[in-house]
């Protein structure tokens, strides 16, 4: 019996006059902001390559399509070995689906702990994307204090690009290296992350891997931005306001933002009497991070 995806793959094959042996069903193009992010990052990577190992941050709202755009960047740059490290392993399905279903990445191979394909059995002549959690790939064996045996291969490869996904989950630990010792992501997420300084951010010089480029992805990297971890030339921003503006100003048919809901932002002005009470204190002690903080797991 044929599935919906089988039919889509057949339609794609007929329309594009290809065998489509990998049954790919997606052929959409990048939206303007995705292309802009790729263009800006490529330009920075190429210009800064001589200075060391360039890094770049995509500060982009949820549903921007960071996964798809990151793959397009890798393809544009001609990268063949890409390592994706995430602080939330549950996003593996999005990374795998985008690579395995879009026509632009035909021939690319995806490897994770849940795939039958391994790095040793993969076709080394074709691009390879390896996905894993930061805790697993860069963690150490608690017994020996050395790299986990099953992950030694990750450290023997000089990667073309290392991508840190969901960076906001790992960017502001009091001691960032402690993440290596956490086997349970929930143990990490529930820790107190109120304290942050630039010194606490990830320093590529002590990562036990080798690579030529770093790409950081996050929808809310506020503390990393406030700390000065990235300079202006290393950041691409795309906010909800940018998206709404693009939706409103789109010219022509097939508006790619048409299906996105209208966003209404409301503010509240604190009464003067409350402001006076607050100003009587020695310090302004109100903190949004504390106001919205939560205790416990789940």
Segments the model singles out, each with a brief description of its role:
Residues 1-59, 68-80, 97:
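ATP-dependent helicase/translocase motor core
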Residues 63:
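Walker A (P-loop) phosphate-binding loop of P-loop NTPases
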Residues 67-103, 136:
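Conserved Walker A/P-loop ATP-binding site and its immediately adjacent core
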Residues 103-145:
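Inter-Walker segment of RecA-like/P-loop motor cores
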Residues 134-136, 152-215, 220-221:
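SF2 helicase catalytic motif II
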Residues 213, 224-298:
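Interdomain helical connector at the RecA1-RecA2 junction of SF1/SF2 helicase-like NTPases
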